[in-house]
């Protein structure tokens, strides 16, 4: 249903629709020529599983991010340990205890990756999909051939869709700038996070982007081209990848992204989408 609606939207605008199959049943959606384009504007369209805790990301504070991941992993161990303890009390078979432990691990992994879909996903990643579609609708006709818009599948399962895309278009992606929007809807601090390769090889381009990001009112759009900045999403699969995301700010954690993967993911600010759309249009236009 989703792919059909997106196809109708794109074809009404004059784009050619295509699908590419990838690993584990991934189906990436494309508008434009993936071999000739200079830019890929991307977002993932798959829906994450509903979890009892958010995916808490602190891009500029790796210590807090890793600590949170460790705590979550330990919480996952609790039901496994309880199940193993009960099995040990109810049976004297070491094999039964071992199978119980492995069974619980497999079940928890399945729930994490393939469990009931989170019906509230305004930020992750309805916001990114809207951005891609908005840019398609507003990009001047003369710039369209420079851009291939791609909606990746199976990002939540481990960047599967984008990895499949990269494998299929190995030569083209070496030179293409990949602008990947993920979770841009909730927060006043919007970051463009370029890859290490892009920082090293094209610092002048990043400096020009900073002028495009200036003057955004109460919201800020920043090119984060110095220091550690971690945001796990599809841009990580590309040498010239740029992650684009929105964050809130606190004195305790610095910039952070929360609520996603839970029923509380209900915020997607239109202004965020508009700001990012205009910045990306400027980036594409500067090379015209």
Where are these regions (language model features)?
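Sequence-level motif detector for i,i+2 pairs with an aromatic at +2
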Residues: 26, 36, 174-176, 239, ...
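Active-site-adjacent substrate-binding region
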Residues: 187-288
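Acidic/histidine-rich catalytic neighborhood of metal-dependent amide-processing enzymes
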Residues: 2-12, 24-27, 84-89, 93-203, ...
């Amino acid at each position: 249903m989703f792919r059909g609606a997106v196809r109708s939207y794109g074809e009404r605008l004059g784009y050619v629709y295509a699908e590419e199959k990838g690993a584990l049943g991934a189906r990436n959606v494309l508008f434009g020529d993936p071999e000739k384009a200079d830019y890929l504007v991307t977002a993932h369209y798959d829906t994450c599983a509903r979890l009892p805790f958010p995916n808490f990301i602190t891009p500029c504070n790796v210590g807090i991010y890793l600590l949170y991941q460790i705590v979550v992993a330990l919480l996952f161990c609790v039901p496994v340990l309880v199940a193993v303890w009960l099995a040990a009390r109810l049976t004297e078979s070491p094999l039964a205890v071992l199978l119980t432990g492995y069974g619980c691990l497999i079940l928890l992994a399945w729930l994490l990756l393939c469990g009931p879909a989170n019906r509230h996903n305004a930020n992750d990643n309805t916001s990114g999909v809207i951005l891609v579609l908005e840019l398609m609708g507003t990009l001047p006709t003369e710039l369209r051939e420079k851009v291939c818009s791609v909606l990746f599948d199976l990002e939540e399962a481990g960047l599967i869709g984008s990895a499949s895309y990269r494998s299929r278009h190995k030569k083209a992606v070496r030179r293409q700038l990949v602008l990947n929007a993920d979770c841009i809807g909730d927060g006043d601090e919007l970051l463009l996070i370029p890859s290490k390769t892009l920082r090293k090889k094209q610092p002048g381009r990043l400096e020009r982007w900073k002028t495009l990001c200036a003057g955004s009112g109460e919201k800020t759009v920043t090119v984060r081209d110095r220091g550690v900045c971690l945001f796990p999403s599809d841009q990580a699969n590309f040498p010239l990848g740029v992650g684009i995301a929105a964050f809130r700010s606190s004195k305790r954690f610095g910039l952070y992204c929360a609520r996603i993967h839970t029923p509380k993911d209900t915020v997607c600010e239109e202004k965020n989408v508009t700001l990012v759309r205009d910045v990306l249009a400027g980036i594409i236009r500067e090379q015209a």
